[in-house]
């Protein structure tokens, strides 16, 4: 199940690894896990997914009032600060195919250490690797964009509000 992505004029075979903790993660745990994942060699990109943590109440009688959720915090990943806008329920890691076995050992160790409540790990293709129509609409000529952005676009959102690139 290896896919190919052109990355800086060379072809890299990539595989996605999905970590599915049995509980939502707190901001502190998310920060710790992401930093440990980024310490592994061969990581192409990491996507966190989960329930949104809005700044304001989106509907109902309290519409527009601020939501002071304890997990909507600024976390530091690899020295870069980012606002955590979701209650993390899954982490998708795109890895270089040649390093999959070594990375899987590291991911398994990270999960055992940080998720005492249990977790599942899946290997497969969970992200887009070929440009979508929305990518063309958002970026136009996609030959000049970072390949890690392929399939990450929300047509109605500003890029800086929806994607945070960690290098």
UniProtKB/Swiss-Prot annotation:
Coiled coil regions, renumbered to chain: none
GO process terms (BP): methanogenesis
Residue spans crossing the bilayer: none
Alphabetized UniProt keyword annotations: Methanogenesis
Pfam families linked: MCR_D
Claim: DNA-binding is one of the keywords in the record: no
Known partners and oligomeric status: MCR is composed of three subunits: alpha, beta, and gamma. The function of protein D is not known.
Protein name per the record: Methyl-coenzyme M reductase II operon protein D
Species this chain originates from: Methanocaldococcus jannaschii (strain ATCC 43067 / DSM 2661 / JAL-1 / JCM 10045 / NBRC 100440) (Methanococcus jannaschii)
Gene behind this protein: mrtD
């Amino acid at each position: 199940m290896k896919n190919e992505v052109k990355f800086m004029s060379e072809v890299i075979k990539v595989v996605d690894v999905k970590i599915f903790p049995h509980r939502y993660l707190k901001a502190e745990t998310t920060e710790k896990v992401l930093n440990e994942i980024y310490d592994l060699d061969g990581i192409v990109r990491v996507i966190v997914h989960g329930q949104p943590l809005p700044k304001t109440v989106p509907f109902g009688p309290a519409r527009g009032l601020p939501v002071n959720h304890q997990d909507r915090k600024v976390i530091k990943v690899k020295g870069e600060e980012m606002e955590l806008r979701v209650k993390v329920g899954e982490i998708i890691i795109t890895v270089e195919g040649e390093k999959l076995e070594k990375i899987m050992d590291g991911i398994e160790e990270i999960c055992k250490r940080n998720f005492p409540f249990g977790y599942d790990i899946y290997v497969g293709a969970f992200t887009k690797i070929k440009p979508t129509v929305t990518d063309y609409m958002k970026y136009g000529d996609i030959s000049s964009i970072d390949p890690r952005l392929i399939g990450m676009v929300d047509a109605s959102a500003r890029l800086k509000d929806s994607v945070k690139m960690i290098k």
